[in-house]
Amino acid sequence: MFDIGVNLTSSQFAKDRDDIVTRAFAAGVNGLLITGTNLRESQQAQKLARHYPHCWSTAGVHPHDSSQWQAATEEAIIELAAQPEVVAIGECGLDFNRNFSTPEEQERAFVAQLRIAAELNMPVFMHCRDAHERFITLLEPWLEKLPGAVLHCFTGTREEMQACVARGIYIGITGWVCDERRGLELRELLPLIPAEKLLIETDAPYLLPRDLTPKPTSRRNEPAYLPHILQRIAQWRGEDAACLAATTDTNVKTLFGISF
């Protein structure tokens, strides 16, 4: 099983990053996609992906950091994307929930990254929160020019999920679905996601599954907990966990064009 969303550059992993990766593979995880959320972290993610086996990375600017987007950023992302470890542009998209960057700054950076991905023939790794309508409006003209797209950490509605799937977008599911309160609506959507469009992720160190036992004293999520998320998703979809793992691995290879 492959974790498509690990924030391995996080300071929460600074002291034991080697152990985090070792535990993940010991738990049965067979690959990690390390998320880049701004230029500096994208550069760090690429170096980590080169350092660890069976790891890849993304290069891009998260909507929270969109105010940093400028011509030099674009040039650096394009240069970084040429590295073999970098297999997607992102994390890019819109987040109108907190607006750490203005909506205008977010839209400018999102469209710029869609253009880069199209020009480089690379998939996009996307984020959307409280911005679905505008997100789809900006994304749609680019979809036919992109080799693929995933909306990571999906927490939206049934209608939003169906709108994404209808456009060929992959859906990334995290341990959010394990939350006995916030995850209930998402849990009900799991059987409706086509198997060929489903991907799994931890978004570590964030979104520790709330039903994990025993809970780590640090309250920190890590990719070694991906098997727990996989088991829960399989349970709520009514399918075999091993089969689901194989299916999502195939989806990863198809979307990102990698072998593991």
UniProtKB/Swiss-Prot annotation:
It comes from the Bacteria. InterPro entries: DNase_TatD-rel_CS, Exonuc_TatD, Metal_Hydrolase, TatD-like, TatD-type_Hydrolase. Its main location: cytoplasm. One of its GO terms (cellular component) is cytoplasm. It is found in: Cytoplasm. PROSITE patterns: TATD_2, TATD_3. GO terms for molecular function: 3'-5'-RNA exonuclease activity; magnesium ion binding; single-stranded DNA 3'-5' DNA exonuclease activity. Keywords: Cytoplasm, Exonuclease, Hydrolase, Magnesium, Metal-binding, Nuclease. A divalent metal cation binds at E91, H127, H152. The keyword Nuclease applies. The keyword Nuclease applies. Its cofactor is Mg(2+). Its EC number is 3.1.11.-, 3.1.13.-. CDD domains: TatD_DNAse. Monomer. 3'-5' exonuclease that prefers single-stranded DNA and RNA. May play a role in the H(2)O(2)-induced DNA damage repair. Belongs to the metallo-dependent hydrolases superfamily. TatD-type hydrolase family. TatD subfamily. PANTHER family: DEOXYRIBONUCLEASE TATDN1, TATD FAMILY DEOXYRIBONUCLEASE. NCBIfam families: PRK10425.1. This is 3'-5' ssDNA/RNA exonuclease TatD. It comes from Escherichia fergusonii (strain ATCC 35469 / DSM 13698 / CCUG 18766 / IAM 14443 / JCM 21226 / LMG 7866 / NBRC 102419 / NCTC 12128 / CDC 0568-73).
